[in-house]
């Protein structure tokens, strides 16, 4: 066997094995599993500090998962202010409509899901500053 073929087999083996290791972030299509958007809304609904209105999900941009004490899901999303008032309304993805012509933020939430306990925990939530932009048909 030539050196090139042997090297190629080693590289392919490492790639195949590393994708199965716990702790490695794996990409998923955002529309494959409806739970991804549920977890995005769960993360968004917890953000009430220094806000008068809840934000709501505009677009779920990307999803990655990592197996560590359950499964961590890294959700990258575009969010903007909704019509629901904090302290008056309860957050609901069905009732909290996106306000018109409001700036949006790019946010990343890490949600931990423990399927054996049916438990979801928000581990982190970070956003960019609010910016105005053209609302695309995503």
UniProtKB/Swiss-Prot annotation:
Its main location: secreted. Residues 32-116 form the Cystatin domain. It is found in: Secreted. Induction: Up-regulated following blood feeding. It comes from the Eukaryota. Disulfide bonds join 84-96, 107-127. Residues 1-20 form the signal peptide. Inhibitor of cysteine proteinases. Inhibits host cathepsin C (CTSC) and L (CTSL). Suppresses IL2, IL4, IL9 and IFN-gamma (IFNG) production by different host T-cell populations. Reduces IL6 and IL9 production by host mast cells. Decreases nitric oxide (NO) production by host macrophages. Decreases dendritic cell-dependent antigen-induced proliferation of host CD4 T-cell. Impairs host leukocyte recruitment in vitro and in vivo. Probably decreases apoptosis in host cells. Decreases symptoms in mouse model of mannan-induced psoriasis-like inflammation by modulating immune responses. Belongs to the cystatin family. This is Iristatin.
């Amino acid at each position: 066997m030539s050196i090139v073929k042997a090297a190629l087999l080693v590289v392919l083996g490492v790639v195949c094995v590393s994708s199965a290791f716990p702790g490695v972030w794996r990409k998923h299509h955002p529309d494959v599993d409806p739970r991804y958007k549920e977890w995005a809304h769960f993360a968004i609904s917890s953000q009430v500090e220094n806000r008068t209105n809840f934000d709501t999900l505009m677009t779920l941009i990307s999803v990655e998962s990592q197996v560590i004490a359950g499964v961590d899901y890294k959700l990258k999303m575009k969010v903007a202010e909704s019509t629901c008032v904090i302290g008056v309304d309860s957050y609901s993805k069905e009732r909290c409509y996106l306000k018109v012509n409001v700036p949006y933020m790019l946010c990343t939430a890490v949600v931990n899901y423990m399927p054996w306990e049916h438990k979801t925990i928000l581990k982190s939530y970070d956003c960019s500053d609010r910016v105005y932009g053209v609302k695309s048909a995503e």
